């Protein structure tokens, strides 16, 4: 026999009441444990906020002051001084060591990686660039592309091609993405992977038609297709 609406309502209300009773009973039986858990959460959150405000924030401010000279040397292509300092001001390596938890310390890894690449120390460059955590999509794309450049110099073309494609896809834009795809296509041709090369070139043509790389992309597509 079907239950009446009142019976259904009473059953639902009774179930809810029982659930609330069980919850209240659980809280009452575990009051000490729950209090400890809540206090632990408060302590953890408070410690984290205090760490950020009282420790990291002043360190960040100091790091920003310290990195200025190294950035100036970097802009002048004085990469050794940028990396190691000049005796009066810190270089990127010292800033990484002294201020690693900060955003500036992270940025110093990017600068260090590019500096080592320019000095021909490709393994060191890759190490620093891989440890760099990009916050800006454009800088991230350039960093991954720089890793690929180093792999090319080391003769590791498979890794280079993968990194160029990764760089092109990371924060896709009309400037760096077609550059990275063009480099990827060239490396794929070096590897004899002409299908992948055509795919990279076709992507430039389809997705970045107004880029500088797209102006003469047809001849690269034709060349790769002829080698298939």
Cite the ranges covered by each PLM segment:
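N-terminal positive-inside, membrane-proximal cytosolic segments immediately preceding the first
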Residues: 2-40
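Short solvent-exposed coil/turn linkers within tandem alpha-helical repeat scaffolds
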Residues: 57, 96-105, 119, 133-141, ...
């Amino acid at each position: 026999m079907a239950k009446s609406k009142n019976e259904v309502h009473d059953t639902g209300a009774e179930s809810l009441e029982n659930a609330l009773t069980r919850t209240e009973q659980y809280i009452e039986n575990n009051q000490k444990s729950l209090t400890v858990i809540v206090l632990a959460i408060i302590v953890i959150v408070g410690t984290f906020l205090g760490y950020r405000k009282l420790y990291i924030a002043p360190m960040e401010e100091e790091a920003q002051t310290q990195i200025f000279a190294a950035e100036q040397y970097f802009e002048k292509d004085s990469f050794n001084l940028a990396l190691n300092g000049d005796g009066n001001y810190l270089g990127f390596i010292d800033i990484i060591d002294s201020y690693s938890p900060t955003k500036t310390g992270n940025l110093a890894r990017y600068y260090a990686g590019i500096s080592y690449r320019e000095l021909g120390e490709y393994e060191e460059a890759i190490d620093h660039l891989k440890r760099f955590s990009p916050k800006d999509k454009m800088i991230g794309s350039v960093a991954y592309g720089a890793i690929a450049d180093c792999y090319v110099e080391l003769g590791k073309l498979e890794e280079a091609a993968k990194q160029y494609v990764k760089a092109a896809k990371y924060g896709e834009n009309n400037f760096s993405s077609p550059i990275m795809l063009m480099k990827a296509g060239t490396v794929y041709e070096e590897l004899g992977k002409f299908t992948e090369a055509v795919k990279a070139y076709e992507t430039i043509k389809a997705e970045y038609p107004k880029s500088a790389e797209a102006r003469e992309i047809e001849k690269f597509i034709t060349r790769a297709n002829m080698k298939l």
